[in-house]
């Protein structure tokens, strides 16, 4: 039986990247919660950037 998680950077960024989250009301809510909490990574797009 195949495992359920088959990682792909492209799919991850397209689904959970910053621009994808900004498109929906719920996604913007996610970003605002993560900002309020003080997360260094707001979305999957932030994983590419060195800090």
From Swiss-Prot:
NCBIfam families membership: rpmH_bact
Name of the protein in question: Large ribosomal subunit protein bL34
GO function terms (MF aspect): structural constituent of ribosome
Region ranges (Disordered): 25-51
Leader sequence residues: none
Gene Ontology biological process terms from the UniProt entry: translation
Basic residues: bias regions: 31-42
Highest taxon above the source species: Bacteria
Gene3D superfamilies, sorted: 1.10.287.3980
GO cellular component: ribonucleoprotein complex; ribosome
Family, similarity comment: Belongs to the bacterial ribosomal protein bL34 family.
InterPro entries in UniProt: Ribosomal_bL34
This protein's UniProt keywords: Ribonucleoprotein, Ribosomal protein
């Amino acid at each position: 039986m195949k495992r359920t998680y088959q990682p792909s950077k492209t799919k991850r960024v397209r689904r959970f990247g910053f621009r994808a989250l900004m498109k929906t009301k719920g996604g913007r809510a996610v970003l605002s919660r993560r900002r309020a909490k003080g997360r260094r990574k707001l979305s999957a797009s932030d994983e590419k950037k060195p800090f």
